[in-house]
Amino acid sequence: MIQAFGLSDKGNSRRDNEDRFAIHEDLALFVVADGMGGHKAGEVAAQMTVDAIVETVREKPAGDRSDADLLRTSIERACDQIRAAALREDEYAGMGTTVVAARVADGRLSVAYVGDSRLYLLSHGQLRQVTQDDTWIATMLASDPAADRAALEHHPLCHVLTNAVGAMAQTTVHVVEEAIEDGDVLLMTTDGVHDVMDEWRLAQLLLEDDDPRVIAENLVRSALARGSRDNCTAVVARCM
């Protein structure tokens, strides 16, 4: 059994909310996307991606393929749909989105993701980031772990995405599978949340309450209070 709640806020500085999320406890499926593109195209790309993932998982024949493969296929399907829409409509040219999708079944956590929306796992009181950001700074730190992170964080390319759904000629869908236990908590966020809170603060909020609704509300409220200038989305799912 999984208890989950999600919350999204357009934030302190944005006119529109281009974040989208989905919670389907019957499918043990959770999705967060952060769209990009002018004229509301970002929210279109994010919603298309969320819809494609949910539809693909619902259509899965019993016993067919692993959840990780299924999630990968669903995101690839979203890529095709977004690129087709961009070719049909000039206003959608260049639109894209990040996405992180997770499914829990039979003691296994399956995750597929693109971009810098994140999934964290809280297990036995310890918080760990499961996904890895597809950003310029993450690429630089991966190639040179001894690099000056503080200096890189002030570089103008710091948060530029190196991978996105639909917005680039090629998209790489990353997948992760690992064991999960009763009592573990999943946290999925867009950068409007995790860019203004470190892992210590995120863990503190996750440990302060057992109710996913309260936790999600506190996460978004805290991000806004810390001056987040982006849309803020948090999904919290507790395995029971």
Task: State each model region's role.
Residues M1-M240:
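PP2C/PPM-type serine/threonine phosphatase catalytic domain
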